[in-house]
């Protein structure tokens, strides 16, 4: 039983790390090519076997299929990334918890400090290349992947149960507290829909994962 849980933990971490990579930086041509590979398509087909994920996975696959016919797809997708995530909160969907959870909607608010506390508590080093406040979505998802993998060091059921409680608290307090608002913003400004569909998939996966952790 414990081995099955650990194997599933590896899959969960892998999904969070994959989603983190989507929000960390623009996709290169090489990375984009991989999305059309059999391996990635099989991975997405596997995710779509879950009823809760199927609609958002299908929307993401639809965006991938449309990318094949999109002129200068890599450049256009990089422009989408820039417009959505790097410009202004007024005309995009900035990927920071502070934007959505503080009254003034400014960067480096209380959510960033809370995230710093999570990182320090677990001694996790974030990707230095990101050079972003701690409540950037890519950092938060990368951290969650690390939190999950670290729990695989446990051998006793009660320790794993405690780890599940902590992981669920992180998902609820640090992610699902603002991701639906972030998703609404992205839906408003992402005309092509690649990143919007990725965010919807992330929200669906967080909700599903939370149900698994408390189940």
Swiss-Prot record:
GO terms for biological process: protein complex oligomerization; protein folding. InterPro entries: Chaperone_TorD (IPR023069), DMSO/NO3_reduct_chaperone (IPR020945), HscB_C_sf (IPR036386), TorD-like_sf (IPR036411), TorD/DmsD_chaperones (IPR050289). Involved in the biogenesis of TorA. Acts on TorA before the insertion of the molybdenum cofactor and, as a result, probably favors a conformation of the apoenzyme that is competent for acquiring the cofactor. Belongs to the TorD/DmsD family. TorD subfamily. PANTHER family: CHAPERONE PROTEIN TORD, CHAPERONE PROTEIN YCDY. Disulfide bonds: none annotated. One of its GO terms (cellular component) is cytoplasm. Keywords: Chaperone, Cytoplasm. Pfam families: Nitrate_red_del. It is found in: Cytoplasm. This is Chaperone protein TorD.
